[in-house]
């Protein structure tokens, strides 16, 4: 069993969601980073054949610039996460790497559950145009992070950032937004 983090972005999970249709941009995979404390997710469209160096670039551009270096990272045994480059990088940054074990969901079950949910949302959101899923990914990410999660009793934005960003509906219907609070 993994220890529970005490603050946002102290411990994260990383995974790749593959098996998506190739888009006009050539993307067929989503690199997922999930904060284990707030359940906030960062999702980046990419190609399934991405290498460890490119994965680290996405991480630093999409996660580190906003949340800093985590103390620990949980990932599956994808070759991108097993490379010498990847291990050396995190060792230099004093970040502990933990590899999940197949058939032991307690090591990283939340990531797999979130992955299934995101694939389902992407398929629903893009049912008429399945090869444009990467263009809707930012909206799916925002919706996911704004949704109530029973395991934390709130939404990831509130738990991870201390506030919930406004949406167009909040601006268009301010009465509805204040009633929800």
PLM regions and their residue ranges:
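Generic recognition of flexible, low-complexity loop/linker segments
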Residues: 1-2, 16-21, 30, 60-63, ...
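Short, flexible loop/turn elements at secondary-structure junctions
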Residues: 3-6, 16-18, 38, 48, ...
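Domain-scale segment recognizer with a strong primary affinity
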Residues: 7-11, 40, 56, 69-70, ...
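Active-site beta-loop-alpha junctions of metal-dependent nucleic acid enzymes
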Residues: 44-65
